[in-house]
Amino acid sequence: MDYKHNFATSPDSFLDGRQNPLLYTDFLSSNKELIYKQPSGPGLVDSAYNFHHQNSLHDRSVQENLGPMFQPFGVDISHLPITNPPIFQSSLPAFDQPVYKRRISISNGQISQLGEDLETVENLYNCQPPILSSKAQQNPNPQQVANPSAAIYPSFSSNELQNVPQPHEQATVIPEAAPQTGSKNIYAAMTPYDSNIKLNIPAVAATCDIPSATPSIPSGDSTMNQAYINMQLRLQAQMQTKAWKNAQLNVHPCTPASNSSVSSSSSCQNINDHNIENQSVHSSISHGVNHHTVNNSCQNAELNISSSLPYESKCPDVNLTHANSKPQYKDATSALKNNINSEKDVHTAPFSSMHTTATFQIKQEARPQKIENNTAGLKDGAKAWKRARLLERNRIAASKCRQRKKMSQLQLQREFDQISKENTMMKKKIENYEKLVQKMKKISRLHMQECTINGGNNSYQSLQNKDSDVNGFLKMIEEMIRSSSLYDE
C-alpha cells in the first residue's frame, strides 16, 4: 500500500515525500474546517509553510497559542531564529523523514556572521538619505532650499537670486557690455592688485585725482547689474576668507609689509567687506588720463593700506589665484593703452569680474581632486578599520571559546576522578559485605545442624548447651565484623 499518495489510509499524509500541512491532524486549531476547505491542486500547498525547514512554529495551532505572548511587540513567531536545540521542535523524526544532524558547538564562521550582522546595522547610516545642512534647515523659505543656487549662495535675497548664474556658467560666462551712451568714458579693467583699493571710490579718487562717477547704464538694467555686483562681492569675500584661513594654517614666518601687497589687499577687503556691499562699483576714467599716473596712484594706495593694517594681516597669502592672474593684469594694461591711443570707447565687465572668474576656475579645478582623494582615503581607512575591528572581535571570541572549552574539559576531568574514587570505595565495601554474608551463612548452617542433632534432648543440660552455642555464635559474628574493614568505618 502506498502511504505517500493514499491520504485516506495514511495517518500522516505526505505530499511529494514531505508532510502535507493542510491535512495534518490539528486538534487545537479553531479554524480546522477552513483549512480543509481551502482549494489546493495536486502540487499546490499553502505558501505560509516552509517545507525546507519544517518547524512546529509554522503550525497554525502553535501560532494561535503563542501569538498573544509576542503580540505587544508585533513579533511574528514564525520568523524566530531556531535555537540550538530547538525549543518548539521535537528531536524525534516524523514518519519516513531523515534524521538531521545538529551541531551543538558554535564555530568561527557563525561568529563572523554575527559580526557581519553588526556591520550591516552600523551601515544603516550610509543607506539613509542625506540630512539637510544647517543653513538649509534654518532657511524659512522652502523655495530657496529647493533652488540649487540657494545652496551655493545662501545669503542672497529673493530678487538677487533671480539673476544669479549657475555654478557651471560662473567660470566661463562674462556679462555682456551695457549699451554705451554719448559720453565717452573708459572703464578700466580691474585686476586683483587694484580691485581691493578701488572699492573705496572716494578715497582713491582723492589720492589719485580721478573723478568718480556712476556709469551710464539704462534704468532697466540697473537692478540686474546691482544684483550681479553684490553676488560678485559676496562670492569674492567668501573665497578670500577661505584662502586667508588656509594661508594662516600653512605659512609659518611673516615677511615685511613691502613684499605682501597681495595679502594686504585681500585682508583689507575681508576687514572692510561690510562697508563695501552697498556701494556702487563702477568707476569712470577719462580718456585723457595718463596710464603712468594711474599705476602710481594704485601703488600709493596699496602702500597706505598695507601700512595701516596690523602686523598679523601683513603675512603673505599663499594663494595660487593671485599668482596666476598676473598675466591677465598685463594683458589688461596693454589693452587699456591701445584703447587710449586710438580714442575708442571701452566698456569692461564690473570690477573684479576677471579676478573672480580666475579664482573660481582654479578652485573648480583643484578642489574636486582634493575632495576625491580625501574621500577615497577616508573610505579606504574606514573599510580597513572595520575589517580590523571585525577580525579582532572574531579573534577574541575564538579565544574565549577555546578558554571555555578548556575549562569544561578540566571540570569534566575533575568530576571523573572524583566519581572513579567513589566507585572504587563502594566496590570495596560491597566485597567486604559479601564476604561477611558468606561467613554468616556458614555459621548459621553449622548452628542449624547442631540444633537438629540435639533437638530431641529436653534436659536442662541441653538448654545450657543451646545458650552457650548462641553466645558463641554472636561472639563469632562480632569477631568477624571487627576483623573486617567495616568496623573501622
UniProtKB/Swiss-Prot annotation:
A Gene Ontology biological process term: positive regulation of transcription by RNA polymerase II
Domain bZIP intervals: 384-447
Record has Ion transport as a keyword: no
Induction: By nitrogen limitation.
Listed InterPro entries: bZIP, bZIP_sf, bZIP_transcription_factors
GO cellular component, one term: nucleus
Short name of any one Pfam family annotated for the protein: bZIP_1
Residue ranges of the region described as Basic motif: 386-406
Molecular-function GO term, any one: DNA-binding transcription activator activity, RNA polymerase II-specific
Keywords annotated in UniProt: DNA-binding, Nucleus, Transcription, Transcription regulation
Cell compartments where the protein resides: Nucleus
Location of region: Leucine-zipper: 412-419
Family: Belongs to the bZIP family.
Function: Transcriptional activator of promoters containing ATF/CREB sites. Can independently stimulate transcription through ATF/CREB sites. Important for a variety of biological functions including growth on non-optimal carbon sources. Regulates the expression of COS8. Has efficient silencing blocking activities.
Name of the featured protein: ATF/CREB activator 1
Phylogenetic lineage: Eukaryota, Fungi, Dikarya, Ascomycota, Saccharomycotina
Gene: ACA1
